[in-house]
Curated annotation (Swiss-Prot):
Signal peptide: none
Taxon lineage: Archaea, Methanobacteriati, Methanobacteriota, Methanomada group, Methanococci
SUPFAM superfamilies for this protein: 4Fe-4S ferredoxins
Source organism, top-level taxon: Archaea
Protein name, UniProt field: Pyruvate synthase subunit PorD
Subunit-level organization: Heterotetramer of one alpha, one beta, one delta and one gamma chain.
Gene: porD
Cofactor, how bound (note): Binds 2 [4Fe-4S] clusters.
Binding site for [4Fe-4S] cluster 2: C44, C64, C67, C70
Cofactor: [4Fe-4S] cluster
Pfam families given in the database record: Fer4_21
GO function terms (MF aspect): 4 iron, 4 sulfur cluster binding; metal ion binding; oxidoreductase activity, acting on the aldehyde or oxo group of donors, iron-sulfur protein as acceptor
Length: 86
């Protein structure tokens, strides 16, 4: 028997599974450069970017997989990358 796709036994359970260790690159957000366009927040497929009480965006590295979509969508280059250390 061949499994064609993953089986999701409990929809919405990804919040229980920290996936931050999958990264090769870590996005670094510079709130000084950030213009609060929310592109990073909108395009993050993991919902790992949230706005704090001061209106600054923060990356939750427990769930960030390092796809760097946030960096590619930032119009002012406020997000850079660094290689993740082992």
């Amino acid at each position: 028997m061949v499994t064609i796709a993953a089986i999701i036994y409990e929809p919405g359970n990804s919040i229980k599974n920290k996936t931050g260790t999958w990264r090769t690159f870590r996005p670094i957000l510079d709130n000084e450069k950030c213009v609060k366009c929310e592109n990073c927040y909108i395009f993050c497929p993991e919902g790992a970017i949230q706005e704090d009480e001061n209106g600054n965006f923060k990356i939750d590295y427990d769930y960030c997989k390092g796809c760097l979509i946030c960096m590619n969508e930032c119009p002012v280059n406020a997000i850079t990358k660094v290689r993740e250390e082992k």
